């Protein structure tokens, strides 16, 4: 089965040697996204809610480039700098995934790239 590299200017360019996403068959594997504004290339300043929104918007843009949407997401992994931000992150998360409710794990990590508060990766399935 062939794999296809997914890239869009509507999401941040990767900050390392990886793709924004890879599509294999009906699956789309979105790389970890941090709250970088794709227009400025800068980290979104602000609290966990603002950073969560930017991360999900980045994932959404990548999925759209692959012909999918947030409704097609089946699994999300959330990395938080501080698990005390869990409830606030969930407030924003539920605005985007309230209906589809993909499987998910959320973990606290000691540090994230560029010292952001959150990173998310997603797997989608699109027929």
Curated annotation (Swiss-Prot):
Transmembrane segments: none
MF terms (GO), sorted A to Z: deaminase activity
Domain of life, per lineage: Archaea
SUPFAM superfamilies xref list: YjgF-like (SSF55298)
GO cellular component: cytosol
InterPro entries in UniProt: RidA (IPR006056), RidA_CS (IPR019897), RutC-like_sf (IPR035959), YjgF/YER057c/UK114 (IPR006175)
Family, similarity comment: Belongs to the RutC family.
Protein name: RutC family protein PYRAB12510
Lineage: Archaea, Methanobacteriati, Methanobacteriota, Thermococci, Thermococcales
